[in-house]
């Protein structure tokens, strides 16, 4: 059940079997927005089963909604020094930097990528921790107040702490991801 970016790599490395869609009659119900995608442009290797977004999880007790409404910039706000979490993976961290700077999420321009690396380095003094799954404990227990994370996971955390809220910076852009089913060749 790989994510979109890994499916593209697996196709490129000839690691997946082509699917026989005669054996997948319910594929007809897959929304057109999830067919002929950049990661599987000919719809040969994958069937999406879930999708999601990356947004900003924050604690309404401590974080000013006006700051969150500024979008990704809140993750650099010194007002929340040592209460900000950041992804511990380059894909999502660079994506946030790209959106913050107004760059295309798929940019390969070396100058733009260096600018992203630079603002991520500038962010380091205000970041409490670089995390993945640790975000659950840190946000639910109010050790941290702001974190970028996956919307579905944020909804689960919000059930555990009524002070948590989710913001999707639509004006700046956000990552949309797809996880799909595939059949490996081996």
Language-model region placement:
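Solvent-exposed coil/turn segments that connect beta secondary-structure elements
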Residues: 4-6, 24, 60-62, 80, ...
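Short helix-loop capping/hinge motifs at secondary-structure junctions, enriched
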Residues: 61-70, 102-109, 186
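Extracytoplasmic/periplasmic substrate-recognition and gating elements
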Residues: 159-186
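A bilobed periplasmic-binding-protein/Venus flytrap-type ligand-binding module shared by bacterial periplasmic
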Residues: 55-62, 99-100, 177-186
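Hinge/capping helix and adjacent helix->loop/strand transition within the periplasmic-binding protein
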Residues: 61-85
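Ligand-binding "clamshell"
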Residues: 11-18, 40-44, 156-168
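A structural signal for short loop-to-beta-strand junctions that line the ligand-binding cleft
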Residues: 1-2, 17-56, 83-85
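Ligand-binding pocket segment of bilobal, Venus flytrap-like solute-binding proteins
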Residues: 6-7, 85-89, 93, 97, ...
